[in-house]
């Protein structure tokens, strides 16, 4: 990781659509966003859509911490649970590039796209790997986390800490009222 921490046997989950051409350059990458997973990108993929698997080889990598990639819930010791290290957009992009190179020997990415936090990853891709990425599209994403985003995250944290079951930065049973509050915070941010 960017921090220098090594997560033993880290892995990145992903899903692909379409066929990789012989030049290995008909690639679109659309990573998942905060709390998202590859299945949630599926509705945006289809014949005649911008993410058309008849034309492109589409790779949907899952972000670290979403459960389909290395996360606090599935990491090996000593990185399990509350000991899970900080993971940055840079770390996700580095893992995604390795996935593309090691698994598919990609020579070029036609489009690096993303929504929200994966839009932030699209910016990182364009800045760090301009040799590989031809185009980037960030939908509702920022190049860095804004004060508005930090305020939302602080609201989530306050809601989580308000549950009666919160002890030592951990909760094993969520109060339904708290979950409703968290959903309301998320809905407000989506407006």
Where are these regions (language model features)?
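A short loop-to-beta-strand scaffold at the N-terminal edge of the catalytic core in hydrolase folds
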Residues: 7-19
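Gly/Pro-rich cap/lid or specificity-loop segments adjacent to the active site
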Residues: 35-120, 124-127, 131-153
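Short beta-strand element of the alpha/beta-hydrolase
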Residues: 24-35
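Alpha/beta-hydrolase-fold enzymes
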Residues: 132, 138-191
